[in-house]
Amino acid sequence: PRPGRPRPVAPVMSYKIKSLEVDARVRDQVAQVQVSQTFVNTGSRVLEACFVFPLPYDGAIDRLTLLVDGKEYEAKLLPAAKARSIYEGYIRRNQDPALLEWMGTGMFKTSVFPVPPGAARKVTLRFTQLLKKYGQLTDFLYPLASAKFTSRPIETIRFRVAIESRAKIKSIYSSTHSVDIHRADEHHAVVQCEAQNQVPGEDFRLFFDADQQKLGASVLTYRPHESEDGYFLLLASPEVKAAREDRQDKTVILVVDRSGS
């Protein structure tokens, strides 16, 4: 018998994220954020790409701008109900299950654009966001966890957050990542974080405390479940002073009520 005709092999469709760079400027409670993501079509056919950006939850987003290789593209901000419908459509097609983590928060979506085999595209998103605040503590969040479902590790992940505050900056702390902090003076600081060849496992989160008092202190509490023990985080920092100025004495007292009342 004649050998059967070989079946055609479907072209491989794949991509990798080469770099993800986040550059933010925070003035008091308002953040101007620029996100640049470079991805490469590593497959053998044209890739129809659609850039989807889950919005930071509880963040007021304004002034959205999208550029692809420096060219501005039409894009739209979807409300929560429409975003939920699109999310569920992705799940039915087994695409990007990470989007389930952001159901109900809304998302940013571009038009589809082609990427030739072997070509790279740089997508840049700029937006202004009103940050959440807990007393004197300001919370900056970037939704990085949705990238953990990418098929390959991201070659370079880089964060730079420049903080400017009218009040004196006290504590600066990231609960999720190891960061480098450079303080130019008591009103300005730059926070940086970089990783190579990693698949993100959680969002990037940064807290900073700004106060006019000589000693800044903030407390955060967390309880995973009603039946589990809770935790608290105390951030305390004196103001940044010149060498010739007197240092403020510090006495730290912790009071724990175990009565259950």
What function would you assign to each model-found segment?
Residues S237, R247, V256:
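Cleft-lining beta-strand/loop regions that shape enzyme active-site pockets
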Residues I253:
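Hydrophobic "anchor" residues on beta-strands that sit immediately upstream
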Residues P1-A236, A242:
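Subset of Sec-pathway N-terminal targeting signals
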Residues R258-S261:
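Short acidic, Gly/Ser-rich segments with clustered Asp/Glu that frequently serve as metal-coordination loops
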